[in-house]
Amino acid sequence: MTRKNTTTNPWAKFHGPNLGYVIEQYDLYVTGAGSVDPELQELFEIFGAPSFQDDVVTGDNTATHFSPQNTGNIEKILKVVQLVEQIRSFGHTLAHINPMEDAANGQSLLERAMNELSDADLKAIPAKTVWQDAPEGIHTALDVIHRLKEVYTQSLAYEFSHIQDSEERAWLHQMVESNSLRQPLSNKKRTALLKRLTAVEGFEQFLHKTFVGQKRFSIEGVDMLVPVLDEIVLEGAKNGVEDVMIGMAHRGRLSVLAHVLEKPYSHMFAEFKHAKIEGAVANSGWTGDVKYHLGREQVVSNEEVSTRVTLANNPSHLEFVNPVVEGFARAAQENRKKSGLPEQDTSKSFVILVHGDAAFPGQGIVSETLNLSRLNAYQTGGTIHVIANNAVGFTTDSYDSRSTKYSSDLAKGFDIPIVHVNADDPEACLAAANLAIQYRMLFKKDFLIDLIGYRRYGHNEMDDPAVTQPQVYKKIKNHPTVRAIYADQLQAAGVLNADEIETITQFTQEQLKSDYAQVPPADTSDATIHVKVPDVVAKGIQPIDTGVELDSLRAINEGLLSWPEGFNVYPKVKKILERRKDALEENGKIEWALAESLAFASILQEGTPIRLTGQDSQRGTFAHRHIVLHDTDTNETYSPLHRLPNINASFSVHNSPLSEAAVVGYEYGYNVFAPETLVMWEAQYGDFSNTAQALFDQYVSAGRAKWGQKSGLVLLLPHGYEGQGPEHSSARPERFLQLAAENNWTVANLTSAAQYFHILRRQASILGTEAVRPLVLMTPKSLLRHPLTLSTASQLSEGRFQPALEQENLGTKPNKVKRLVLSTGKMAIDLAAEIESGKHEYNLDEIHIVRIEQLYPFPAEKVQSIIKRFKNLEEIIWVQEEPRNMGAWHYMAPILFELAGDKVKTGYIGRPDRSSPSGGDPFAHKAEQELIVAHALDVKYNFRQDKLEIEVFSN
């Protein structure tokens, strides 16, 4: 028998879904239809059925009482609770968020639930029963349903149910349900909004009529993108944000430049006319780029606040700008002027990424970048994503461009709140912008706005979209612009009359005409097929002494080999480190990793911050670096480079996610925005770097020539043929050499620890100067500890990086030398090792070997001076381990031909042309490599009897 307690009612604490659960459990308890939690069962025995005495205000203002056990409405209460949650979760399926469609028809789930409840049923249930925080004036469940449908099924639609954090989810629902987002705008702000839309539309239409047939990638159809960006930028400024970084593609870019970044109309028109105009600041490199790829930096302000806005330069490779801009933001957020890790303040800057509806789900770089959003090494405290959704990608309809309902669905997997908004409802768009910036500033996480509009013209203005989308373009042709829609709304509301609206339009037109009148006639006098590279770039990097005093190096080494008392270093690692103790003494030898650590420390002591990332960079792919130590008992980490004396610059080394493209883009962006920092990206193996090829092609190699965007990014690409197969042998140096021109970067493949030490220090010395350029290093694997790559302390304390090195003990009898062998990297060491081994007999008097340490720019003067010493030289041979159609041969061949002149032959020794970089059989590899070495050194036996085919000579 139930024992009722009339003094305390525990059920009063339950509301909404929790209430529904309790009622459902009581029903099971009474009917015996299922098992009930023992604690709940005890409560039912003590207190009886859940009883909720609540006043329900009816239509005649009389109050009735509601109690589930008295009315038998348990099932109806459950249905109401479920309906409330379904509206919150699936209201977006009913919302009118697409201006080209009527209200959504995908209503089945919600419609069925609503049809099972009559208005009378809903009126009988008090609001508090299903919505604990129901606003004032909401009395019954019917009021609740009407209110929630108003919130969730209009021109703003929300997807929050996938958010895992209950606090965030509750905050989001409270924000949209409390009416705080949709407070009426003041007449002043409404008028300003109409003026902005008039300016955007007027600018686009002026371009359309004045520059007929020229590409501009119009914003028309998602015109509200500009006011949305305005709102986010200025609200961010009110929150103290110093830098707003924007990444976007070409669609709408000109309007964003002109309005959000305040680029004068006259400057825009001058670019269309190819005219020179006074005051225009060149923001491109010597080759330049099309106008809708260029970026801009501008301080944006109103009467209250100001902030710096940066629109990143961008290629037409959609979405690849995303990680670049994230790198901008992280660089702006960090203080790198102290030792240890940089100090990050995510409130100093944030990112806005404008995506395309086809590109957001279509380009893998998007998900790679989203994956960075909460990683310690890459998070920027939240990005605001805006999908400029015009429902078509070039000529491809959305049903052919994605496998999901919404273009934004990818974001759900990264726990990102999503708001869909009709781009024809300006005030709803601003509400979405406000929610986005508030969420970002409070929770430091990403937020996405799906701005759903249309594209008034074709992909570009020379396209006829009716060819592929005839029906929708019939609609678009007759569809009013958002400016016209909003003007009518303001006129109907009495905010403005027709004359005032016309005055706004005329003012915009007069401004456009006036600015156009300032533009002089076209001037093509400087158009030339001979593009002049700036002198400072053309002359290359000048020789720089990079030695460090021996006493300083010894002090650094001592610091590198110390750690806090009680810190338990892994025994194997401890032995590796202890072997370095005497490396700088008289008979000591310095291996690759120690040379790197010494270079890092000396660079830090000179005030240059360092950032190194890669998939295994803390330890090193080949267990060689150990720059971050792990305590075997606590797993705490320690880096000696954080505790060295006399350092006023930060050092950070991070293991990256299993991603190349996004991480390379991020590090490039970081370096562009922090030019004083030595930023390095290390591939796990150089073979995998080609998944970032678009970044190398569009940004790292060409960014300065196209946009004047300087970078000193260092790429560390493990490279070398060691019989490990086609996926662990080649960093594809041929691709970097093919991109090499105009001194755009340095490509090197080194053979000693000292050379690595000096080239790192040289790179650090040019950061922040006009001489800066990226550095592409083919780094070693098996050579990391090879005896022939070790260096002495004096080789670090004296001198500088040498672009070419001569093999010791060769060429001592110049008149006898007939063959000059050039090689690089591991191939050069294999040749040296064979000579040192003494296994075979060579006529070494007739051979000289030069190691080309710096492949690009090629050290022509140095090599030419060597050639001149050998009066009887007959041939210059390039020897490589890569197949003939790969590696450096096709880059080197014309260089050697020019160096050799008419009397000296040039040739190639190496593997023949192949489609795969390397074979998979380590024994075949070893035999091939031995044969290449033998040919190069001309060992005395008949090679032609060998079954392996080797390209011996090419004239």
From Swiss-Prot:
The enzyme's E.C. designation: 1.2.4.2
Its BP terms in the Gene Ontology are: glycolytic process; tricarboxylic acid cycle
Q: In this record, what's one Pfam family?
A: Transket_pyr
Q: Which cofactor does it need?
A: thiamine diphosphate
Database matches in SMART domains: Transket_pyr (SM00861)
Free-text function comment from the UniProt entry: E1 component of the 2-oxoglutarate dehydrogenase (OGDH) complex which catalyzes the decarboxylation of 2-oxoglutarate, the first step in the conversion of 2-oxoglutarate to succinyl-CoA and CO(2).
Q: By what name is this protein known? A: 2-oxoglutarate dehydrogenase E1 component
| Name of the encoding gene | odhA
